[in-house]
Amino acid sequence: MPFAAGLWDALQRDLPLLFPQIILIVTATVMLWPGDVFVPRGDKRRWAYVTVIALLLSAFTVSGTPVGQGFNGMFQVDGITRGFQYLVLAAGVITVLLSQLQLDALGEQTVEYYALLLFSCAGMLFLVGASDLVSIYFSLELMALCIYILVAYLRTQARSIEAGVKYFLLGAFSSGILLFGISLLFAAGGGVTTNLAELNQRLALAPPSSSLLVFLGVLMVLVGFCFKVAAVPFHMWSPDAYDGAPTPITAFMSMAPKAASMAAFLRVFGTGFNGVSSDWMAPLAFVAAASMILGNVAALRQQTMKRLLAYSSIAHVGYMLLGVMAAGSPGGAQAVWLYMLTYLLMQSGAFAIVIFLQGKGEGERIDDFRGLGRTRPLLAFAMMVIMLSLAGVPPLLGFFSKFYLFKLAMEQGHVTLTVIALLTSAVAAYYYLAVVALMYFKEPAASTEAPRPMGLVTTWVVGLSCALVLLGTCFGAKLLDWAATIV
């Protein structure tokens, strides 16, 4: 049986590349059935512990996965794969922890909630290592389909349902554009392969008669990716989805999908399509500049913290796209990864504080932070550190991650974009510092309630994120070298 023997050899060779994903998929499947059948209904919260264990076990196996390609070039493990897989899994753990802070608002957290989180994380782990346009597409869909449901998880709230439907419809539209772009590139490459490395060589040698086909294909793939990271002008879904989703899912969307999509951006445009960079460099520069400008300007007018963080995340995507444009140079991928790590730390701390305040009927509006420095000085200090780091104030970790990204862009000749990034960072500092001023220079609202204890989860998430942001100030000059050991 030569076929069976060959299949067994291929599985033995290639399956170890997917051990982290296999752990998550098997765990989620067992949780849905037979686990959900035999676990009493009142014990559903134990699935949170199972989910965290699965995510940590998956993270433990990431470092042990062999470097190389598998499945006929559909998937590969390298520094980018491992580095961004760690970020995705960390975001998953943080989301499960934050979900425990909103049990009452979310209602009963059924096993499906955690299974969808695991399936979505598995899709992201596939995405960061996908080296073929077809595997990239299916990974994106596995990631997105689960998030559509999680956004609309609060079935009794019209706002959550509306956000989920909008996200799903626009997501389906963008997936169609992405798939059409892939088909055009497949045709322009001779109809032979969709592997990134091989397709890049074929597109670079394509005859002039195929130049329009190549340009349209690359442009459509770029549009599909820009939607996934909520870059301007494909950001329309982001504020409503962030505002309507359960806050832990909002935090998840701001961290994990962005990390996975940025890894795909690096692989497709930073290295995969560098042979036809003239076709996508100018459109990507426009998207990056528009994201930085519109994201920061729109954030100035927001009245709720979730929408402020939504528009802020659009601006941060613009900064990271600036790094993608320079990713072909030494240190490019490391600078983007470091920025994404810093962003994950800051977002996790900010959303933990928002969720904690929502537990007492506050935190929804920015005005709810009024006088927090007097009523909860430690929480206000942590929020101040996070806001200052998001603004890029030295010597916090956010400053160093922006510095390396902007320095790299300058060295690659993107002077105009770097100037735009610096100017829009000054705009961002205004609305971040406005939150700090509200906490320390405004009187708190009158309240007769005794201060509610922070709890173990809030203390750990906020404390750890704040401590790491502060600790980064001590190692600023060595951060990029450290990132190079991981990515």
Protein language model features and the residues they cover:
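Alpha-helical transmembrane segments of multi-pass membrane proteins predominantly involved
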Residues: 1-487
